[in-house]
């Protein structure tokens, strides 16, 4: 029997052979002794083999023997012990229960022995924490141990075993199954913390079981019929994977109640593969089944499968199949795949037009290709020849589509000689609409002064035909950039391509024979007269003969073959001299001087003349403009700009000269007044006109024409070197932001090269 003390003074007496007896409200030591006596009586009954019930009379007799006579005096040890047990039920000053300190007991409790109880004894008892399900230790105090009570493992009292031996064992203060010590303040309350169990691979194991059911056709509740194949499946699994089946089985539609569902237009093997995927999450992608899988996955709305199939097809793109993949993606509504296939077609158009897929395209697809601005082609003649190849492949059927498709060709951008040959071509000679288009292109060439009024989508060059924009050097946060970046109009990206051999500031760059000539400048210590040449095709540098004069802040441009170096500063004074590089003789020669010394000058070529715009002459910035005629070797003053501009960017478009950005401040003023305004010069009227301003002020801005737009690259806004770039459309008079530079820079030289 075990006697266990609860905080509310309740002793629970457990017996192996008989039902449990609960004594409620016992508050003195006699209750413990009574329980011991009762236990001894139960043992004697068990040893004698008696199985009679323990009746109420026996309980009352034992109670009378122990509780009916209070023989002890108030000063006796028992009374002291009773008082100690009574204090367990009293309330302390802090409102809590007082608990007995085992060290204060006067009566050695080691003489009171308890036996273990088996698990059977607890079947009808309240639930409470136990050290073991097989053994419940005794709770016992010893006179030697004042550190608290211990859980003791007591052997059962067997036949022939004396009580003294049991008591001796109980005083050993050892545990056989546990060495844990229970402190005197242990409340023995049940644990109330929550526990959560997470099964590993639960979903995987569940779907494996479902796959097993599918394999053995067990518990299937729907049959999918594709062609002559019947595929059993489980609605729950299909609905959990496919939005198509989820909508079918969870809504009030006819298929929700049918046991067999016909899948019209679905390839049976692809359907079976996707049903297996629903159970396993695995799918084999092969070239011979990828299109069927993708079309079926699109129908069943299996987004992950669609994405995987699209990525697979992206890896298979080739000039021989990109058009087919592009059309297939468009039919299936796979926008990402269509975009990638289209871009691949545009990038490799020269190879695509030599493959069979191109000549087999319908006229509608040919029209979509011809309308694109993104074709990677060297010139417009390439596209016209591709169109003629397509027409001749089935001349009788396709001749009627020729005039409609010819309208997508940018005929005004073809050479006049090419247009003359077209006019006499048998394919166009008898087609009135084709003749109209050819005449329109001829007028564009014959009447250059009317070109602003003849602008149309056919006069807009394709992106790949306009060349590549290069930004060379400039001032950056490290006090001098040597890197060169190029801008691709088709991808709208800047990419580093090369580095100069050394640092140059306030230098000039011009393009001659598709090569970049870097002229003059300063290296931070001295002004330079050196020239070096960069070949973008071979990505190599070569040293050229130097100028006669050291110059920084100069302007450089190519006019009718030779290259001109205009003005600048030689380290001592502002220059009005001009040198000309003869590429045939490979030498520099002086030409007529300008009327005004100019440094940080803007230089551009327009209508066979060289223009020097603004700059500074030492004391202040200039708003004067003069032009050089190479045939007369003279400089002539032109109309002045509305603003003084040093560090101005200039370029030309459609017979007009544009001056962009710059600063206006005297040399002694450290705070420059930066400009965002733009104005253009018409040489026919000798007048400047203001146009839309840039989004921000830009000093030392690089400006260049690319296609039909003017690009303002980098510059300085008074606080930072800019990496932003914006493009001006003269036809709409609007500026738009484009991709930024990789490196912020001011004073970069920006030129266009046709690669």
Curated annotation (Swiss-Prot):
One of its GO terms (biological process) is proteasome-mediated ubiquitin-dependent protein catabolic process. Disulfide bonds: none annotated. PANTHER family: KELCH-LIKE PROTEIN 32, LD33804P. Pfam families: BACK, Beta-prop_ATRN-LZTR1, BTB. GO terms for molecular function: actin binding; ubiquitin-like ligase-substrate adaptor activity. Residues 158-168 have a biased composition (Acidic residues). This is Kelch-like protein 5. Keywords: Actin-binding, Cytoplasm, Cytoskeleton, Kelch repeat, Repeat. Residues 169-184 have a biased composition (Low complexity). The keyword Hydrolase does not apply. It comes from the Eukaryota. It is found in: Cytoplasm, Cytoskeleton. Residues 152-184 are annotated as: Disordered. InterPro entries: BACK, Beta-prop_ATRN-MKLN-like, BTB/POZ_dom, Kelch-typ_b-propeller, Kelch_1, KLHL5_BTB/POZ, SKP1/BTB/POZ_sf. One of its GO terms (cellular component) is cytoplasm. Expressed in adrenal gland, ovary and thyroid gland and less abundantly in lymph node, prostate, spinal cord, testis and trachea. Kelch repeats lie at residues 468-514, 515-561, 563-608, 609-655, 657-708, 709-754.
């Amino acid at each position: 029997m075990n006697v266990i003390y609860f905080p509310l003074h309740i002793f629970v007496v457990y017996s192996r052979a008989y039902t449990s007896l609960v004594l409620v409200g016992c508050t003195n030591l006699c209750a413990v002794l009574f329980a011991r006596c009762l236990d001894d009586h139960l043992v004697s009954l068990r040893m004698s083999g008696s199985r009679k019930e323990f009746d109420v009379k026996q309980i009352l007799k034992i109670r009378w023997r122990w509780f009916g006579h209070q023989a002890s005096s108030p000063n006796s040890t028992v009374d002291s012990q009773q008082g100690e047990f009574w204090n367990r039920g009293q309330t302390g000053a802090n409102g809590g229960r007082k608990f007995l300190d085992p060290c204060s007991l006067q009566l050695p409790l080691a003489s009171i022995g308890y036996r273990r109880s088996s698990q059977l004894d607890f079947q009808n008892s309240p639930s409470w924490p136990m050290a073991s399900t097989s053994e419940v230790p005794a709770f016992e105090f010893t006179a030697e141990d004042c550190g608290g009570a211990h859980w003791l493992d007591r052997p059962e009292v067997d036949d022939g075993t004396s009580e003294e031996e049991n008591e001796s064992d109980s005083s050993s203060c050892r545990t056989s199954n546990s060495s844990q010590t229970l402190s005197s303040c242990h409340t023995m309350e049940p644990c109330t913390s929550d526990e959560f169990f997470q099964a590993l691979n639960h979903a995987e194991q569940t779907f494996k079981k479902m796959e097993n059911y599918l394999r053995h056709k067990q518990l299937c509740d729907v049959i999918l019929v594709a062609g002559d194949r019947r595929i059993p499946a489980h609605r729950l699994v299909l609905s959990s994977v496919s939005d198509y089946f989820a909508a079918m089985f969870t809504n009030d539609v006819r298929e929700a109640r049918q046991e067999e569902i016909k899948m019209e237009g679905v390839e049976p093997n692809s359907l079976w593969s996707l049903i297996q995927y629903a159970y396993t999450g695995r799918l084999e992608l092969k070239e011979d089944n990828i299109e069927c899988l993708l079309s079926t996955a699109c129908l069943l709305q299996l987004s992950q499968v669609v994405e995987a199939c699209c990525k697979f097809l992206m890896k298979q793109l080739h000039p021989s199949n990109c058009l087919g993949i592009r059309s297939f993606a468009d039919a299936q509504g796979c926008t990402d795949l269509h975009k990638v296939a289209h871009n691949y077609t545009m990038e490799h158009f020269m190879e695509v037009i030599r493959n069979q897929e191109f000549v087999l395209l319908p006229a509608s697809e040919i029209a979509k290709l011809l309308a694109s601005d993104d074709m990677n082609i060297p010139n417009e003649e390439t596209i016209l020849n591709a169109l003629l190849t397509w027409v001749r492949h089935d001349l009788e059927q396709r001749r009627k589509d020729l005039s409609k498709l010819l309208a997508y060709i940018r005929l005004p951008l073809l050479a006049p000689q090419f247009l003359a040959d077209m006019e006499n071509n048998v394919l166009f000679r008898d087609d009135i609409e084709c003749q109209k288009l050819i005449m329109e292109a001829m007028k564009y060439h014959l009447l250059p002064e009317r070109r602003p009024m003849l602008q149309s989508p056919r006069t807009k060059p394709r992106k790949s035909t306009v060349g590549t924009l290069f930004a060379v050097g400039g001032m950056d946060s490290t006090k001098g950039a040597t890197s060169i970046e190029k801008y691709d109009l088709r991808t709208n990206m800047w990419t580093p391509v090369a580095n100069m051999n050394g640092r140059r500031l306030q230098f000039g760059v011009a393009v001659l024979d598709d090569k970049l000539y870097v002229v003059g400048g300063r290296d931070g210590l001295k002004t330079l007269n050196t020239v070096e040449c960069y070949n973008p095709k071979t990505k190599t540098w070569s040293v050229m003969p130097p100028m006669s004069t050291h110059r920084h802040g100069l302007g450089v441009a190519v006019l009718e073959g030779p290259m001109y170096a205009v003005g600048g500063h030689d380290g001592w004074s502002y220059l009005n001299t001009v040198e000309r590089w003869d590429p045939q003789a490979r030498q520099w020669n002086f030409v007529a001087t300008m009327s005004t010394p100019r440094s940080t000058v803007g230089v551009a070529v327009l209508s066979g003349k060289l223009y020097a715009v603004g700059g500074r002459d030492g004391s202040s910035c200039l708003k004067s403009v003069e032009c050089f005629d190479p045939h007369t070797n003279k400089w002539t003053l032109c109309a002045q700009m509305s603003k003084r501009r040093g560090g101005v960017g200039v370029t030309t478009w459609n017979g007009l000269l544009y001056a962009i950005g710059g600063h206006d401040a005297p040399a002694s003023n450290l705070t420059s007044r930066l400009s965002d305004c733009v104005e253009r010069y018409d040489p026919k009227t000798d007048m400047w006109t203001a146009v839309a301003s840039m989004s921000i002020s830009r000093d030392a801005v690089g400006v260049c024409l690319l296609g039909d737009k003017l690009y303002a690259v980098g510059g300085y806004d008074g606080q930072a070197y800019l990496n932003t770039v914006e493009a001006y459309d003269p036809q709409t008079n609007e500026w738009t932001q484009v991709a930024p530079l990789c490196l912020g820079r001011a004073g970069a030289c920006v030129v266009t090269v046709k690669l």
